[in-house]
Amino acid sequence: MKLDLLSFSNMLYYNIIKLGEIIVKIAYVFKSNMASTFQLGTMILPQLEDNSHMVNVIGMFFFDDNIMCLQKGNPVGERLAKIAKEKKMLLMVCDQCAVRRELAEGTFEQCGSGEVKAKGLVDGVVAGCFPQLYSALGPNAPDQVITL
């Protein structure tokens, strides 16, 4: 039997859905302008909510203005916080980005130390830098990191 790539992809997709298997652990980094509004808010989050995303998202790290979607009361942030709690998903904002936007308690000198604390953000969000991200994800390391 000859199997083309499309048939193989469809078969793989069917088997993953049918068996309920999650084959890859993913961490997302939201760096590009509007990534949390567009890719997260309109694609990733709805798929996580209806369990059609097909991968196990173990963490999300937010830079620059992408952290704004995580402000308390923001509909995207509130929905994401609910999913993160259910799925035990890490939500971390860049500590320096949060300090600059008054969404963290701490100083620039404390950035990267683990001493900066998120404030005014949805439940479950922590502030940190790469050392804190690596430490938090280390015991459950992702198979892939996707930067958007």
Please state what every model-predicted region is.
Residues V122-L137:
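A short aromatic-anchored loop/beta-hairpin motif
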Residues H53-I58, M89:
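A generic structural motif
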Residues T42-L45, N74-R79:
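Charged helix-capping and loop-helix junction motifs
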Residues N56-I67:
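A short beta-strand-loop structural module common to alpha/beta enzyme folds
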Residues R79-D123:
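Mid-chain, well-packed structural core segment of small domains
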Residues I26-G41, N66-G73:
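Short, glycine-rich nucleotide/cofactor-binding loops
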Residues S36-V55:
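Histidine-anchored nucleotide/phosphate-binding helix
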Residues D4-I23:
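Short, Lys/Arg-enriched N-terminal segments with co-localized hydrophobic residues
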